[in-house]
């Protein structure tokens, strides 16, 4: 489904070059639940950004369903991000003045889905993460764990093939972290 072949990522920093990734080879199959571990600054987020199409590799190839991305155009990357990938970030990235429901619907608004279908899909995603009774709340009225579940629902609403979660429990207490990881594990089975 997804393969990284000899991926390198080099950043220029002033006069210096930083090798963020050097020769990464990985394969992911459908329904794999994978954790990428390592010390701070070792390239984990860079690799997730490359897999998610948010950043581009310097050398190597990212192969999606047997197709090389070397010749991907902007519209190919846009389609990949909008329809194949769901992102969950440590800092939630929720819009404070919008309700929980509106925050989840936003992902579908960008994909051109009708208002009725957006609402139906967003409610289903929020139900999947145990927040169907919180639709009208604003993010400021929720705990960190609840906000992370909203972020997970937003990642799920497009029914993506791949969920990329970058330190999804980093800002949460131990008990809530376990709950969030259980939700992510359950999602990977579907």
Question: Positions of the model-derived regions?
Answer:
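ABC family nucleotide-binding domain
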Residues: 1-190
């Amino acid at each position: 489904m997804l393969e990284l072949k000899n991926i390198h990522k080099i950043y220029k920093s002033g006069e210096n070059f930083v090798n963020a990734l050097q020769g990464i080879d990985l394969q992911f199959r459908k329904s794999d639940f994978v954790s990428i571990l390592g010390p701070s600054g070792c390239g984990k987020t860079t690799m997730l950004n490359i897999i998610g199409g948010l950043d581009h590799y310097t050398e190597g190839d990212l192969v999606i369903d047997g197709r090389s991305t070397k010749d991907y155009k902007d519209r190919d990357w846009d389609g990949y991000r909008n329809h194949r990938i769901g992102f969950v970030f440590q800092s939630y990235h929720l819009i404070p003045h919008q309700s929980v429901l509106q925050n989840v619907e936003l992902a579908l608004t960008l994909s051109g889905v009708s208002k009725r279908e957006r609402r139906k899909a967003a409610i289903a995603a929020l139900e999947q993460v145990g927040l169907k009774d919180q639709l009208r709340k604003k993010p400021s009225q929720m705990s960190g764990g609840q906000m992370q579940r909203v972020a997970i629902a937003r990642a799920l609403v497009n029914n993506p093939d791949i969920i990329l979660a970058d330190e999804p429990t980093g800002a949460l207490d131990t008990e809530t972290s376990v709950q969030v990881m259980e939700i992510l594990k359950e999602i990977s089975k579907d």
